[in-house]
Design a protein with these regions (language model features):
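Short secondary-structure junction/hinge motifs that connect adjacent elements
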Residues: 24-46
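Internal helix-loop-helix
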Residues: 3, 45-114, 154-161
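A structural signal for short hydrophobic beta-strand segments in well-ordered beta-sheet cores
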Residues: 135-137
Length: 175
């Protein structure tokens, strides 16, 4: 089995947390379509967010198995409104492509649940074909101006930080 003793202990504490804090709120979250920010913060305090992000950036310093356990236990409790997978995906985009300043600024707050993230990939007419995205980002001084449309943005309702898939140079094709 891939689970170590540390993974098993994490699984048990994750299961207890989800049963105590999330399951009693499940129906309300389904009805309203999102989980309130204070529950993200409770999850962060418990170590359920970004458990495989390096400790230097506020994460748990573990391996992907810890993320997998949080996904499994959330699904076990039928908690579909806990978009922690998105939190992890955005964290890894930041780890791979972000500047040092961005990592320091955002990752610790993502791990505590102070910042909720979303990913805007899917577009009307192209779905999730990332090579076919039409959304553009054009440099405007120190900023970028975005033009385009996105749909099905998980966590979009209450996100503080959104990772947007777009093209800065359509001549580059899929790059």
């Amino acid at each position: 089995s891939w689970e170590t003793e540390e993974h098993s202990m994490f699984r048990e504490s994750t299961r207890r947390f989800i049963e105590k804090e999330f399951v009693p709120n499940r129906e309300r979250w389904i009805d309203q379509g999102y989980m309130e920010p204070e529950y993200w913060q409770k999850a962060g305090e418990t170590g359920l967010l970004c458990p495989d992000v390096p400790v230097d950036f506020g994460g748990g310093g573990g391996d992907f198995g810890f993320d997998a356990i949080t996904y499994e236990e959330a699904q076990r409790g039928c908690i579909t409104s806990f978009g922690n997978a998105i939190q992890s995906i955005v964290a890894h985009y930041l780890l791979r492509y972000g500047t040092e300043d961005q990592k320091i600024r955002w990752l610790p707050k993502m791990a505590t649940g102070e910042i909720i993230t979303a990913i805007a990939m899917t577009e009307p007419g192209t779905g999730s074909d990332l090579q076919g995205v039409k959304t553009r980002a054009v440099r405007d001084g120190d900023d970028y101006l975005l033009t385009g449309s996105k749909i099905f943005i998980t966590n979009g309702f209450n996100a503080d930080l959104v990772c947007v898939v777009c093209k800065t140079d359509p001549e580059q094709g899929a790059k």
